[in-house]
């Protein structure tokens, strides 16, 4: 159903892979319906760890070339989602700040110190694209990462100055997350279960989007594209990570797939995405475009 031709959506994300993990299903759905969807990525994710042995030398402790490699992963992910992308200020303008207290916080290009310049850059993008819908994280950045919080702050500064019709915050629902974790019966070697409260989630959501087969498959494929950062326990192998992982699941509805970040904490890849209303026109249904088109 191509009912969104002329509709424009912009997602503002901190690092390559966030577009897939947090919003991949919604972005794929909007694009399939004809919307013009753009992902703005604020850094190259230079401070990330690397899953798999072949590209360990790219990390910031070695060649410090991970950011360039992640551009390649991001381009593949965006193509699989059917959306366009651009970097805030151009590729390499802002650097991944790392977690709170990391030495990367002090880098002269650290995104957390981007000041008014990043606001001006995002203003130019929003003025050029004129989005009907903007998607980012909540005030805590979803899980406290400084770059996610900075992405939230600049997005709201610009969107509120421009009177964007609707802003959504991507969140993880507690109930479905816990049900999915409980459904995972066996873990791949080396993986572990999350400790209580270790995976960020929320009790309240305003919008629950059920991902159809296309949107879920696109999201999973986009996540696989970020093989240095994400490991799906579906027997997938790649040149980045040549080791297959397989998880056992008691209830495939609760946990259609299982994945992990570089911390190897097993998480369910849910067949829903949840959002909170961050601003603008109130939601009237589980269609995030209703009331603003």
Curated annotation (Swiss-Prot):
Which coenzyme or cofactor does it need? Zn(2+)
Keyword check for Zinc: yes
Q: Which reaction is recorded as catalysed by this protein?
A: 1D-myo-inositol 2-acetamido-2-deoxy-alpha-D-glucopyranoside + H2O = 1D-myo-inositol 2-amino-2-deoxy-alpha-D-glucopyranoside + acetate
Using the UniProt record, name the top-level EC class of this enzyme in a single word. hydrolase
According to the record, how does the cofactor bind? Answer: Binds 1 zinc ion per subunit.
Key word Hydrolase present: yes
- A Gene Ontology molecular function term of the record: zinc ion binding
What Pfam families does the record point to?
Answer: PIG-L
Determine the domain of life of the protein's source: Bacteria
Q: Which UniProt keywords apply?
A: Hydrolase, Metal-binding, Zinc
Which Gene3D superfamilies does the UniProt record give? LmbE-like (3.40.50.10320)
Q: TM segments?
A: none
Query: Which GO BP terms, alphabetically?
Result: mycothiol biosynthetic process
Q: Which InterPro entries match?
A: GlcNAc_PI_deacetylase-related (IPR003737), LmbE-like_dom_sf (IPR024078), Mycothiol_biosynthesis_MshB (IPR017810)
Residue numbers binding Zn(2+): 15, 18, 148
Q: What is its EC number?
A: 3.5.1.103
Q: Which family does it belong to?
A: Belongs to the MshB deacetylase family.
Please explain the role this protein plays, according to its UniProt record. Catalyzes the deacetylation of 1D-myo-inositol 2-acetamido-2-deoxy-alpha-D-glucopyranoside (GlcNAc-Ins) in the mycothiol biosynthesis pathway.
Instruction: Supply the PANTHER family for this chain.
Output: 1D-MYO-INOSITOL 2-ACETAMIDO-2-DEOXY-ALPHA-D-GLUCOPYRANOSIDE DEACETYLASE, N-ACETYLGLUCOSAMINYL-PHOSPHATIDYLINOSITOL DE-N-ACETYLASE-RELATED
Put simply, this protein is called 1D-myo-inositol 2-acetamido-2-deoxy-alpha-D-glucopyranoside deacetylase
Q: What is the lineage of its organism?
A: Bacteria, Bacillati, Actinomycetota, Actinomycetes, Mycobacteriales
